[in-house]
Structures are given as C-alpha cells and as structure tokens.
Amino acid sequence: VLRQNGIKTRYYGLDKNQNLTHSNAELAKEAVCGLFENRQIPNDLTLLACGTSTPDQLLPSHASMVHGELANYPMEIFSSAGVCLTSLQALKICYSNILAGLHQKAVCVASELTSPALVSKFYDPEYEATHDNPDKDPYMAFEKDFMRFMLFVYIWIN
C-alpha cells in the first residue's frame, strides 16, 4: 500500500510521546517565514490569506491566529475553510486583490494539522478487541489503521 499511494515522507505535529509540537497557526507561520530572507516578513506585505480545514479553534479565525503568530504589521487578513480547495480559495483572494489593485504584495498559506486526531489512543480499542479475540472480524481495525496511516497523515504546507 505504501508503494502505491506515493507518499514518500510523512510529517507529524507530534513528538514521540504523541504531544503536539506545533499548532496549525504555528505551522502556517513557519511556512510564511520560510518564504523570506532571514525569515523576516516585509512591512509592505498588506494581505495575508490563509486556508485550512483544521483550524486550532473556531474564533478568532485561522488567519487572525497566523497573523498573531507572525507578530507582524497591520494587514488585511482572510480565512478560507473547507476541505480540498481552501488553498485555492486563499490563492484566489490574493490574486484577485492584486489584480484589482487593492494590494501590491500578498501572501497565501494553506496548512493542515490532523495529527491530534491520529494519536494511537483513539485507535487502540479496536485493535485490542480484534487482537484479543481471533474470532472477531479484524476488518474495522484494519480500516481505521489504513485511514490513519495512508490517508490522513500527510500534513502539507504551501
């Protein structure tokens, strides 16, 4: 399965004890800072558009939290939320605002932090039930492990 899904590297927001190492906002901040020399955000950047389907909390918005993590100058912020296309929504906001002449410089970032839902304690009961009872169908335990390791583990940052 690993060979066929094409995933070569996995990144987790967890340490070896399954404690969070970063918030989603911190992951986005790291991605934005990585764009600039010396990791310094230019003060003429006037728009920050952030996309995620896994914000750290509902309020304030993900873009507000990322802006706070950046400890940057005042700027317009925009959050998009959803599933697959949040990064494109954020990119379109930057593109449209620059095209309309409302902003000269903008940054778009998309981040996901699914690691908190992937800690083993959420999957152990199913595994233990099938491991301790050889007559029980192990299909559900396999499905959960498959979803955990094959589909949800890749955390991407644009």
Give short role names for the model-derived ranges.
Residues 33-38, 42-43, 58-60, 64-158:
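Acyl-thioester C-C bond-transforming condensing/cleaving domain
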Residues 4, 51, 109:
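Short acidic/histidine-centered micro-motifs embedded in hydrophobic/aromatic stretches
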Residues 46-54:
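Short glycine-rich or small-residue beta-strand-to-loop segments that form or flank ligand, phosphate
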Residues 1-46:
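Conserved active-site "lid/cap" helical segment
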Residues 16-28, 54, 58, 82, ...:
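Generic, well-ordered alpha-helical segments
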Residues 15, 53, 74-77:
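A general structural-boundary detector
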